[in-house]
């Protein structure tokens, strides 16, 4: 039993006055209330923290989901650009404006630059607007033409189709002239010189091209392209030296060696080839790509044994008493002359070919038909050179 009576919070000393006792009991009561309040606050804080954790988890989950969808959109774009863009727009990851799509392509994170090039080169109205917006994201002010081309050609991979290249280089030339008024008389001049620089880059840095152009030849080739007048020799010489000292960088997803040229061929397979000087049949692995026919001793070889440029050649079906399913490559304009081609000797030397015609035997009639069809498609008159010739004629007519 409590000495001197009980109360909230335990016993009360007997020697306290009545007033002191009441004050002590009041203090104890308030202490208990405070402890209860603290416990209630702790419980409420714990509840709030749980809610915050749940919200954070939901936000993180949303961010994770968004990142997953963006990654999926990029993959879809690399497989089919139109479907990829559509997926990103439908999932509110991209606005449907040409400017927003152009920004997405310009940043290029996780995107295949070959696919970017193909998409930008399409002739649909929307793609053309995207191309325009994409080019406007490039700042070419105070850059010489080679510097501007380096920047432009690093942001995507030029497609192989002449009409696509035409649209893209036209957009580039217009943008360059807008950023650098007074450098060229017209966008046609910029367009033609840009192509001359791209071809110069190939001629100087492709080891299969043995006849390397000099600065003088480059200057001569570009006479009269500035509305009938000549560009300053110093300008052309500086552009030449820039390309000679440093080739254009090719976007990494395509690489810069021959292996990548053969990565996506028009056709490939084993065929028999009749020798040019020694008339024996040799089994070779053929690859048709970029308007050239390459042949290798083995499928694993990185360097071809021979290269046959298909420009100016024709193809015909022939009968051969020793081999079935034969066709020939020949030059209809120069019958009897050796076809311009090259081959690699056993000691590694690159020499000119010895063929007046290339006679080839396929394993079956079906494969012969397929090869002939593919080669015919490849050796149709190259629209790229027609396109460039048209532009040069346009400049000449302005004289």
Swiss-Prot record:
It comes from the Eukaryota. It is a peripheral membrane protein. CDD domains: PH_GRP1-like (cd01252), Sec7 (cd00171). InterPro entries: PH-like_dom_sf, PH_domain, Sec7_C_sf, Sec7_dom, Sec7_dom_sf. Residues 77-206 form the SEC7 domain. Keywords: Cell junction, Cell membrane, Coiled coil, Cytoplasm, Guanine-nucleotide releasing factor, Lipid-binding, Membrane, Tight junction. Residues 14-61 form a coiled coil. Residues 391-399 are annotated as: C-terminal autoinhibitory region. Changing residue 284 to A: Abolishes phosphatidylinositol 3,4,5-trisphosphate binding. It is found in: Cytoplasm, Cytosol; Cell membrane; Cell junction, Adherens junction; Cell junction, Tight junction. GO terms for cellular component: adherens junction; bicellular tight junction; cytoplasm; cytosol; nucleoplasm; plasma membrane; ruffle. A 1,2-diacyl-sn-glycero-3-phospho-(1D-myo-inositol-3,4,5-trisphosphate) binds at residues 273-280, 284, 295, 305, 354. Its main location: cytoplasm. This is Cytohesin-3. It comes from Mus musculus (Mouse). The gene is Cyth3.
């Amino acid at each position: 039993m409590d000495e001197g009576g009980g109360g909230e919070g335990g016993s009360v000393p007997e020697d306290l006055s009545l007033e002191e006792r009441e004050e002590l009991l009041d203090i104890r009561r308030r202490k208990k209330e405070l402890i209860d309040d603290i416990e209630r606050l702790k419980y409420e804080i714990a509840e709030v923290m749980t809610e915050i954790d749940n919200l954070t988890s939901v936000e993180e989950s949303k961010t994770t989901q968004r990142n997953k969808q963006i990654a999926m959109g990029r993959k879809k774009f690399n497989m089919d650009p139109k479907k990829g863009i559509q997926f990103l727009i439908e999932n509110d990851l991209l606005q449907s404006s040409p400017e927003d799509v152009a920004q997405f392509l310009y940043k290029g994170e996780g995107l295949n630059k070959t696919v970017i090039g193909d998409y930008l080169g399409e002739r649909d109205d929307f793609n053309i607007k995207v191309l325009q917006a994409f080019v406007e994201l490039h700042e070419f002010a105070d850059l010489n033409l080679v510097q501007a081309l380096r920047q432009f050609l690093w942001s995507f991979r030029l497609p192989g189709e002449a009409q696509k290249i035409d649209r893209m280089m036209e957009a580039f030339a217009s943008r360059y002239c807008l950023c650098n008024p007074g450098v060229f008389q017209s966008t046609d001049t910029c367009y033609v010189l840009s192509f001359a620089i791209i071809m110069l880059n190939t001629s100087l840095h492709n080891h299969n091209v043995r006849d390397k152009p000099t600065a003088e030849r480059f200057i001569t080739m570009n006479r009269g392209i500035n509305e009938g007048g000549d560009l300053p020799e110093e300008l052309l010489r500086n552009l030449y030296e820039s390309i000679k000292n440093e080739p254009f960088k090719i976007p990494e997803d395509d690489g810069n060696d021959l292996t990548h040229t053969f990565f996506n061929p028009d056709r490939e397979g084993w065929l028999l080839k009749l020798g040019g000087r020694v008339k024996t049949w040799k089994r070779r692995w053929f690859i048709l790509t970029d308007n050239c026919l390459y042949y290798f001793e083995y499928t694993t070889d990185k360097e071809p044994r021979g290269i046959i440029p298909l420009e100016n050649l024709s193809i015909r079906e022939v009968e051969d008493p020793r081999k079935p399913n034969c066709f020939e490559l020949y030059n209809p304009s120069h019958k009897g002359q050796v076809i311009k081609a090259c081959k690699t000797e056993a000691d590694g030397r690159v020499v000119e070919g010895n063929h007046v015609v290339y006679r080839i035997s396929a394993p079956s009639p079906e494969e012969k038909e397929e090869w002939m069809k593919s080669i015919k498609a490849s050796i149709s008159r190259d629209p790229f050179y027609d396109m460039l010739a048209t532009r040069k004629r346009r400049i000449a007519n302005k004289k």
